[in-house]
């Protein structure tokens, strides 16, 4: 049984008649780290808010370990740690320690246990000396770390983290990565949103990609990239732009994408076509040509490009 099941969620905002989310379905299992990606305005935040009962769906249901959560906020509250929109799950006039005690109490922890759990997390991030400082006095990155600690305070079965590495330096982002991987190994299900695709590729086992309210891609990260990399991908830099005639000729053998001025990406449709491709490229004013391995950014661009 999946830890979290999202079944055909849909939402239209009446003020704009915009269908923000259209029949979204997915699952997060115990130990999964799932990255929920998409451009700004694609429907990620609306989906998260429906999962957390902050917005009511027009259709669809959410289940936690097989139990419907629509009318049971307590079930989610006890079992889910949440970081939404940066560090907004905190009281800004309080210290990190006071926030830990409050949020731990909301999830059934004693004051002593909440304090102990929070301080242990802050120690991992090297911020133990900031435990009594007000949140407003902390840097943006430190505030983000405290927000993450608040989400983790009661050792939840499920973590929902919105942009967990936003504003963090490389060292802190790596600590977040290590902690998420450790939690995953211990059976915690984790759903993250992020615009940092390198972080998503590093930490997530599964990718969900939403665009215009629809789920357009769902797959295992490593398996998907391994399949994609069986086809040759070339990055071509010229001294000028391709003419329309040249583009049409290359497109016979390749999926052609213009990356920037005079720079193109060529996905060779068949390995048998490589001789013809290189014959065509030999006639062009090539500045540089190199083979390239696909990464998550290529997948993201493919499924979200307009037109």
Residue ranges and their predicted role:
Residues 177-265:
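ABC transporter nucleotide-binding domain
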Residues 269-307:
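C-terminal coupling/interaction segments
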Residues 159-163:
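Catalytic Walker B motif of ABC-type/P-loop ATPase nucleotide-binding domains
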Residues 60-71, 75-76:
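Conserved ABC transporter NBD signature motif
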Residues 1-6, 10-23, 73:
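A short, flexible loop at the N-terminus of ABC-type nucleotide-binding domains that lies
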């Amino acid at each position: 049984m999946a830890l979290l099941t999202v079944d055909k969620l849909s939402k239209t905002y009446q003020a704009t008649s915009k269908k923000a989310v259209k029949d979204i379905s997915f699952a997060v299992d115990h130990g999964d780290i799932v990255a929920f990606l998409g451009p700004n305005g694609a429907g990620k935040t609306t989906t998260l808010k429906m999962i957390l009962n902050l917005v009511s769906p027009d259709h669809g249901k959410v289940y936690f370990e097989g139990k419907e959560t629509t009318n049971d906020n307590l079930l989610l509250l006890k079992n889910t740690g949440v970081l939404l929109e940066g560090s907004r799950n905190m009281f800004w006039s309080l210290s990190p320690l006071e926030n830990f005690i409050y949020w731990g109490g909301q999830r059934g922890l004693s004051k002593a246990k909440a304090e102990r759990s929070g301080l242990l997390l802050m120690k991992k991030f090297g911020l133990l000396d900031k435990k009594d400082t007000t949140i407003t006095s902390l840097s943006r990155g430190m505030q983000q770390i405290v927000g993450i600690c608040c989400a983790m305070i009661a050792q939840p079965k499920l973590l929902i983290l919105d942009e967990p590495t936003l504003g963090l330096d490389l060292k802190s982002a790596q600590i977040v990565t290590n902690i998420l991987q450790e939690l995953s190994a211990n059976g915690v299900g984790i759903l993250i949103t992020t615009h940092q695709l390198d972080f998503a590729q590093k930490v997530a086992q599964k990718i969900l990609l939403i665009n215009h309210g629809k789920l357009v891609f769902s797959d295992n990260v490593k398996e998907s990239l391994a399949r994609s990399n069986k086809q040759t991908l070339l990055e071509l830099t010229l001294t000028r732009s391709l003419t329309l005639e040249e583009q049409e000729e290359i497109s016979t053998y390749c999926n052609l994408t213009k990356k920037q001025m005079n720079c193109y990406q060529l996905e060779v449709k068949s390995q048998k076509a490589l001789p013809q491709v290189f014959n065509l490229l030999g006639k062009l004013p090539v500045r540089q040509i190199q083979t390239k391995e696909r990464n998550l950014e290529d997948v993201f661009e493919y499924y979200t490009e307009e037109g």
